[in-house]
């Protein structure tokens, strides 16, 4: 008999999404739980689809496709738009932000991914940042 999985501290997304300046919402996606990413390509713009094709490593291409789809789907819900109608502007170093034309709620977001886990933070009228890193085994402090 196998042990039951531990309960998750993560809650399912509410039916209605609303960004708030009083809280930061964190979204996560475990790539192992995502089926074929080919179906997600429909949520990407032609430019994003082209970028996806440039990835030579399949796992990196998958992270990009799933991450961009997640970003578009969450932001579409928050802005009341269709996913493909969500448009982005880019900071000088390439960080995406919502284009002013579709960001009446002053929504901010940040996305990070590492080794099969994607996380996204959203809020309104405040800067947000998020980072996820895969920890590789334990360090032996004696060896340092």
What is the predicted function of each stretch?
Residues 1-144:
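Core catalytic alpha/beta fold that binds nucleotide/phospho-ligands
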